[in-house]
Amino acid sequence: MNRQEREFLNAVNAAVENWDYSYEHYHEWDDFCVDITIDDMDEWAENESDIWRALSEVADEWGAGIDSDCNKYYLGIQFS
């Protein structure tokens, strides 16, 4: 993992540090991807909009793509 990827991962983790979550990061083609799962479904349901907002702010700041499916969030970024 290079410095930019580490900084992006740190920003993503900081955005969701208030919630119980797990994550994985990997490379897919030219993208660096981070998948976030909010582990507690009740916590996710109570905070869904706040979680989306926090991760969207990181995505906007870094120029990353973001998507979600229930309590899972997918972020991807391409570093040149």
Model-derived features: positions:
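An N-terminal amphipathic alpha-helical segment
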Residues: 1-33
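Acidic, low-complexity, intrinsically disordered interaction modules
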Residues: 20-80
